């Protein structure tokens, strides 16, 4: 497999992508990493790292910046690292793309360059949350690709999320829910109530509404919401997880006695394990489900380790038959979902700034 890594995407680019790509190439000699970016900036960094032969550089002279309008910049910057990378996937010269750059531009690039899977109206970013029960995971989508959603979008997110969890995570019968402000069917908004009505007609194991706390319970494996809410939940959870660890450390340091210091030493392995559970770097990146190809959206602050793991997620998805399962399940869902718009206007509707 050949994997594209956007060398210019992210807060720590190009240093973090270059180092992450080198680490992955060394660990996976049977696969190739293609760093796409400004060769004049990438080459000096590679010279210090002595990269293996299965890592190559593909020059791209432009960058879609984090503060630019996503679709406008992607269309205008024809030689951007993100656009060139997606074109390599489209042309069959690579099997997947990973980027820690502008997530809106990744969404735009996936739609405009690769297109949607048949029947998909809006792709979605799917983010994994750690579960307290059984060491499992919960998949939340959309985690930021679509601010405004229709009920059919949420229903499709559920279909894609359920298929992904089965194919990628090996859960035989994932439990699916809609995120709301209470478990009662009378709660929620017109969007969540209508989406729930659609999902009750499906063959999914739909359990109704769940609250935010249930993302971590292990009782459900797929939770759907609009991209605005999902992104707020994702970033809040990230902050809470790291904040709890920080507050615990501060409490121990403030006490400062011998007992506290001994206790801190004994707790160190547990704290390190907890940090790994809540650290986004361990998950690498979130797949963009619903495009005709594999695209992984990595955190903007991704470290080399995070990008190493994101490349691992891309490889596993490309090798695991996930795309075929997504296509099959979306096709089956046409029996109970309303007709989706087709053609260029539908694609443009899914791409915004």
Curated annotation (Swiss-Prot):
Record GO terms (molecular function): phosphate:acyl-[acyl carrier protein] acyltransferase activity
InterPro entries per record: FA_synthesis, Phospholipid_synth_PlsX-like
Pfam families attached to this UniProt entry: FA_synthesis (PF02504)
Keywords for the protein's UniProt record, in alphabetical order: Cytoplasm, Lipid biosynthesis, Lipid metabolism, Phospholipid biosynthesis, Phospholipid metabolism, Transferase
Coiled coil: none
Domain of life (superkingdom): Bacteria
The keyword Transferase is annotated on this UniProt entry: yes
This protein's GO CC annotations: cytoplasm
Main location, first listed in the record: cytoplasm
Localisation per UniProt entry: Cytoplasm
GO biological process terms on file: fatty acid biosynthetic process; phospholipid biosynthetic process
EC number: 2.3.1.274
Catalytic activity line of the entry: a fatty acyl-[ACP] + phosphate = an acyl phosphate + holo-[ACP]
Pathway entry: Lipid metabolism; phospholipid metabolism
Metal-binding recorded as keyword: no
Family classification: Belongs to the PlsX family.
Subunit-level organization: Homodimer. Probably interacts with PlsY.
Function, in words: Catalyzes the reversible formation of acyl-phosphate (acyl-PO(4)) from acyl-[acyl-carrier-protein] (acyl-ACP). This enzyme utilizes acyl-ACP as fatty acyl donor, but not acyl-CoA.
PANTHER family, per database record: FATTY ACID/PHOSPHOLIPID SYNTHESIS PROTEIN PLSX, PHOSPHATE ACYLTRANSFERASE
Name this polypeptide is given: Phosphate acyltransferase
Species annotation: Myxococcus xanthus (strain DK1622)
């Amino acid at each position: 497999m050949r994997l594209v890594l956007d060398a210019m995407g992210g807060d720590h680019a190009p240093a973090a992508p270059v180092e992450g790509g080198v680490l992955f190439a060394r660990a996976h000699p049977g696969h190739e990493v293609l760093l796409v970016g400004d060769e004049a900036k990438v080459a000096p960094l590679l010279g210090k790292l002595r990269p293996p032969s299965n890592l190559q550089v593909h020059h791209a002279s432009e960058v879609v910046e984090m503060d630019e309008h996503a679709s406008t910049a992607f269309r205008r910057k024809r030689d951007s690292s993100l656009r060139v990378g997606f074109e390599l996937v489209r042309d069959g010269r690579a099997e997947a793309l990973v980027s820690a750059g502008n997530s809106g531009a990744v969404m735009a690039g996936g739609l405009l360059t690769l297109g949607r899977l048949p029947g998909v109206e809006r792709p979605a970013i799917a983010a994994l949350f750690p579960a307290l029960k059984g060491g499992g995971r919960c998949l939340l989508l959309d985690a930021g690709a679509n601010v405004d959603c229709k009920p059919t979008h949420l229903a499709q997110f559920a279909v894609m999320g359920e298929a992904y969890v089965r194919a990628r995570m090996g859960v035989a019968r994932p439990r699916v829910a809609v995120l709301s402000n209470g478990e009662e069917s009378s709660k929620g908004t017109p969007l969540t109530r209508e989406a729930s009505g659609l999902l009750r007609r499906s063959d999914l194991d739909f359990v109704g509404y769940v609250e935010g706390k249930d993302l971590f319970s292990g009782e459900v494996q797929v939770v759907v919401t609009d991209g605005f809410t999902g992104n707020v939940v994702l970033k809040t959870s990230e902050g809470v997880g790291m904040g709890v660890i920080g507050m615990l450390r501060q409490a121990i340091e403030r006490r400062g006695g011998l007992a506290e210091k001994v206790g801190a030493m004994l707790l160190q392995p547990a704290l390190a394990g907890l940090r790994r559970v809540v650290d986004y770097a361990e998950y690498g990146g979130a797949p963009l489900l619903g495009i005709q190809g594999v695209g992984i959206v990595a955190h903007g602050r991704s470290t080399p380790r995070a990008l190493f793991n994101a490349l691992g997620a891309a490889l596993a998805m490309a090798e695991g038959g996930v795309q075929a399962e997504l296509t099959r399940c979306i096709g089956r869902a046409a029996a109970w979902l309303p007709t989706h718009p087709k053609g260029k206007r539908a694609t443009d509707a899914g791409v915004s700034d």
